[in-house]
């Protein structure tokens, strides 16, 4: 049986746009977990805080469930898929209305040993 060398964490239906999440995830993909946490800490963005929590969860899964060393971990995969969209309407002039899409994300982070 093969030894497990990666761990995954997900945050589903997070109230942040997938497009904005992907901008942050592109910065940490392939980096050492310590560097990735430092990058997220100093990124002034709502998505960065959420992604930091998911990354810490993936690290905890790797340490507690699979006995991997934190020092050897890198962010092997990081992606944001589109979740359900909440549709709202904003009243406009002359009795019309414009749609507002409140988008959500499913954020996934996978850490693996280098």
UniProtKB/Swiss-Prot annotation:
Organism for this UniProt entry: Streptococcus gordonii (strain Challis / ATCC 35105 / BCRC 15272 / CH1 / DL1 / V288)
UniProt record, GO biological process: translation
Gene3D superfamilies in alphabetical order: Ribosomal protein L22/L17 (3.90.470.10)
Keyword RNA-binding tagged: yes
Function: This protein binds specifically to 23S rRNA; its binding is stimulated by other ribosomal proteins, e.g. L4, L17, and L20. It is important during the early stages of 50S assembly. It makes multiple contacts with different domains of the 23S rRNA in the assembled 50S subunit and ribosome.
A Gene Ontology term for the protein's cellular component: cytosolic large ribosomal subunit
Keyword Nucleotidyltransferase in annotation: no
UniProt keyword terms in alphabetical order: Ribonucleoprotein, Ribosomal protein, RNA-binding, rRNA-binding
HAMAP family in the cross-refs: Ribosomal_uL22_B
Pfam families: Ribosomal_L22 (PF00237)
GO MF annotation, one: rRNA binding
Family: Belongs to the universal ribosomal protein uL22 family.
Subunit description: Part of the 50S ribosomal subunit.
Protein name: Large ribosomal subunit protein uL22
InterPro entries: Ribosomal_uL22, Ribosomal_uL22_bac/chlpt-type, Ribosomal_uL22_bac/org-type, Ribosomal_uL22_CS, Ribosomal_uL22_sf
């Amino acid at each position: 049986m093969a030894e497990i060398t990666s761990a995954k964490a997900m945050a589903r239906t997070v109230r942040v746009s997938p497009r904005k999440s992907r901008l942050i995830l592109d910065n940490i993909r392939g980096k050492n977990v310590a560097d990735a946490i430092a990058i997220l800490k100093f990124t002034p963005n709502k998505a960065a805080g959420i992604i930091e929590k998911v990354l810490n969860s993936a690290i905890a899964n790797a340490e507690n469930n699979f006995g991997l060393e934190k020092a050897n971990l890198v962010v092997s995969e990081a992606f944001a898929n589109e979740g359900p969209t909440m549709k709202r309407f904003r009243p406009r002039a002359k009795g019309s209305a414009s749609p507002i899409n409140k988008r959500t994300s499913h954020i996934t982070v996978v850490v693996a040993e280098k």
